[in-house]
Each structure stands twice: as structure tokens, then as C-alpha cells.
Amino acid sequence: MATNLTLETDKEIKNMNQLSMIDTTITRPLANYHSSVWKNYFLSYTPQLTEISSQEKLELEELKEKVRQMLVETSDKSTQKLVLIDTIQRLGVAYHFDNEIKISIQNIFDEFEQNKNEDDNDLYIVALRFRLVRGQRHYMSSDVFKKFTNDDGKFKETLTKDVQGLLNLYEATHLRVHGEQILEEALSFTVTHLKSMSPKLDSSLKAQVSEALIQPIYTNVPRVVAPKYIRIYENIESHDDLLLKFVKLDFHILQKMHQRELSELTRWWKDLDHSNKYPYARDKLVECYFWATGVYFGPQYKRARRMITKLIVIITITDDLYDAYATYDELVPYTNAVERCEISAMDSISPYMRPLYQVFLDYFDEMEEELTKDGKAHYVYYAKVEMNKLIKSYLKEAEWLKNDIIPKCEEYKRNATITVANQMILITCLIVAGEFISKETFEWMINESLIAPASSLINRLKDDIIGHEHEQQREHGASFVECYVKEYRASKQEAYVEARRQIANAWKDINTDYLHATQVPTFVLQPALNLSRLVDILQEDDFTDSQNFLKDTIKLLFVDSVNSTSCG
């Protein structure tokens, strides 16, 4: 006991010594972030509490086989097959049936291609099929919707009587690419009419419409969709009890797995001693884990979630160091040290920065150790290259702030799409996921793809829209809003409109690669798509001020039960 007390005392003295070496005469642009809303909550999820029983595993496999049978035995030519696939995807269990769904959608697409002239006037079926087929990366022409328009290209008013048809047309529009004017028209038409009819709908349909208008299926995070749709689905009179039982049990088992991982990561975070070593930074361990789960939620991605969470934690602290605490003169040697990525650089940086630098070094050591097991240690090179780009871009922002520079929009975006860290996270996702990726595919993603820069632009502009007011309450570098206002002598509102226009176009770039970059496996594109979805669901600056929507979402995924034993 005496030894432990001595060790703790030594640790406290060391921390005090590090912090006491900060020049207190320097004025620092402190952001005054709120403390974590979760603190050590997830430490309570012990291995015993999160253990998955052999009975649960057995029951899951039995139910999965029955759902698989249901999926295989339903004819690919039937409307029921489309509805079943859509339901399985929304309920979050499609990952169990990837191959079956892939084969079915291929058959459905082939059948459509052979019978294009067949007269199908059911908007619900046409729109649902369009969304599911494009969702599996088959290019189905948007001309399928021409039959629902008048000679002037406007959608027929008679369609307003078909709520499910309108809802599915609305959902389909979010898979549009550049130049699809009919889908632009469809989006405007469906939003207008769904909003006006929503108050008159029955509770179940009203819930679906309300949720869709807030967040369409395609741009939503699949793991977030699942618990919300489970609650909607069990209130649909025609729901399938067996399917409902399966999805609830699957959600429950995955939730236990995520709780255990959160508990382990909370211990790691506690050992980092945030409040003493990084008091200037956001305390966002749980939110970082949510981000990682939004990219990869399946049981096979435990390592990926751990490594991505740690990376986002390090990026968050580093971002706050550059953005809300350190001086420019302190940041120059720190940037050089990160580029060197070696222990000998430790003496060149301010003492209070050294704990973070050590965590940074430890992270890349851990990555190298993990990838060596897979024979993929050479992948670490790509992560280090992206980290160097990121850290240099942080310094560029600090330089702009120091010199009161508001750059032109294009110059701002070139730098800011790096500082949003989307590319760093994306490349790390691909590195740690455990899949084989060729050098050519890495090079394509980094240098040639539309999807990677589009995803970064969405993240940057959405972050600037939702975080702008908070950031301008303190000394902070210019966002896209300030750059646009200055360059074009525009209002803030006009800047927001332009940012949203560019976000919409970036989604079309994502969809273009998703549909047409057929040489690239889906698992390579999926993380970029999911990273875009993660930021798209945020309504305010939820990552920084995570006491509202994001807190409720995290609770929904990692705390609340879906009653796995009570199945309708």
C-alpha cells in the first residue's frame, strides 16, 4: 500500500513539474470545453456483465439460419424480396447475409435490364428497386422515373396520394450523381409533399416520414438506423416475429461486445491522465469510440475499432493543442518532432507536450506491432504520410491565425480538408481493418479517387456550418464562412447556402465513385461513405458539445436495451 501511495505521489509531482514549466504569462485562446458527460461510466461494464453466453450464441445462429432461409426462399422476382432486403438492411443485420443479398440484387438488376420496356407503374416498387440496386453499386438509370412525370418534366400531382411511393422516391434521390435533373426535381417534389402530409398520417407512417426527413437512409449511419427502425418495425402490424427476435438478439450481443470494448478503452484513457496532462483538450473518449463504431460495427472489427478510437483521441488532443492552447513558437518544434516520429525528438519540444508526443509514438509502435502479425507492417508508411500532412496543415492554420490571415476559399479548403483529419482516419481504417489492399488501391484512394476528397469536404464544410458560432466566441482561425464572406462580400447566410451546395455536390462525387469505380472493392469505399454519414447526422456541434443529440445517440447504441428477450 505504501509503495502504491509513493508511486501515485511521484506521478502527481511529475505532472505538476510538467505543467509548471508552461509559461503562465502567455495568453492562450482557451476554449473552455465542458467535461465528459460519460466520465468513467463504462468502467462498470465488467467482463462478467458483458459476457455473451453460449445459449445466446446458439440461439443467434439458429435464428440466423431461419432468416437466411426466408431470404433465399423468397423469389427475386417478387416485391416481397425487395421489401425483405430493405427491412433486413434497416434493422442492421444485413452484414450476416452479404452474399445472399448481393446475389439477389444482381438477379433483380439483370431481370430489369432484360425487361426494360415492361410497364411498371408502381412508384413504390420502382423507387425501392432503384435504391437497393444502386446501393449494391449497379448503375440503374434515373430514367426509370420519367414515366411518373408530365411533359414539362414535373412529377404528376396524382403521386401525392401514394405516401409510401413518395417516401421511397425521396430516399432514392440521395443516390443521385451529377447531371440527374430528374432526381433533383424528385427531391424537391417529395420533400414539399411529405412535409405537408406528415401531420395527417397514422403514427407508424408518420414516424417513418419524420425520421426520413431528418435523416435519409442512405446518408444515415447504419448502426444508428438499426435501433430506431427496430422500434418502428415492431409497431408495424405485418412485422415478422422471427425476424424481430433475431435482430433484437443480434443488437443485444453486439451491444455487449461494444460495452466491453468501451470499458477497456476507458481504462486506457484513464491511464492517459487527461485532466492533468491535457486539461486544454476535449475529453471525448466515448464520442471517439462512437465514431469508430460508425465506420465498423461488426464483430470482426474489434481491432479496427480500438485503433481508430485511439487515433481519433490523439487527433482530438492534437487539434486542441494547435487550435486552443499552444503558441506558434511551441508548435513549430512539435510539428518537426511529429514528422521525425522518433524518441530522440522528445527534448526538442516543450515539457508539457511530451506526454502527448509519447502517446503518439506509442500509437505507431502499436500499429506496427499489430500489422506485423498480419505481414502488413509496410502499411504503416501510409498512416505516417497522412499524419505528416495533417500536422503541417495544423501549423498552417496556426500561422494564418498568428498573422490574422483570412485566405481565399479555395486555399482554405485545400488546407482545411486535411485538418478535418478525415483522410488520416480513412487511411487508418483501411490499414487496420484486416483486409488485403494492394499498393495500387492505396495510391488510387489517396491520389485519384473522388470519394476521399469528397468525404473530407463534407466533413470540413459540415463542421464549419455547425461549429462556426461556437468557434468565433474565442480567438480562432477563419472557417469557410469567414473566407466566403470576405472573398465574395457575402452574408453569413449566403456562405451557409454555398457550403450546403458544395456538400450536396460532394455527395454526388461519392456516389459517382461508388457506382463507377468498379475496380475498387466495396470494403475500400465503405469507410469513406460511413465517415461522411457520421458527420451528416450531426445537427449541431455535437462532437464538441456532446450533451444533446450525440449523448442520446450514444445512449441508444451502448446503454439502452432493445429487449432482446421480449420480441413483439
UniProtKB/Swiss-Prot annotation:
A motif (DDXXD motif) lies at residues 319-323. Its EC number is 4.2.3.59, 4.2.3.40, 4.2.3.-. Mg(2+) 1 binds at D319, D323. Keywords: Lyase, Magnesium, Metal-binding. GO terms for molecular function: magnesium ion binding; terpene synthase activity. Sesquiterpene synthase involved in the biosynthesis of volatile compounds. Mediates the conversion of (2E,6E)-farnesyl diphosphate ((EE)-FPP) into beta-bisabolene, and of (2Z,6Z)-farnesyl diphosphate ((ZZ)-FPP) into alpha-bisabolene, but also smaller amounts of (Z)-gamma-bisabolene, (E)-gamma-bisabolene and nerolidol. The Asp-Asp-Xaa-Xaa-Asp/Glu (DDXXD/E) motif is important for the catalytic activity, presumably through binding to Mg(2+). Belongs to the terpene synthase family. Tpsa subfamily. This is Sesquiterpene synthase 14. It comes from Solanum lycopersicum (Tomato). The lineage of its organism: Eukaryota, Viridiplantae, Streptophyta, Embryophyta, Tracheophyta. The gene is TPS14.
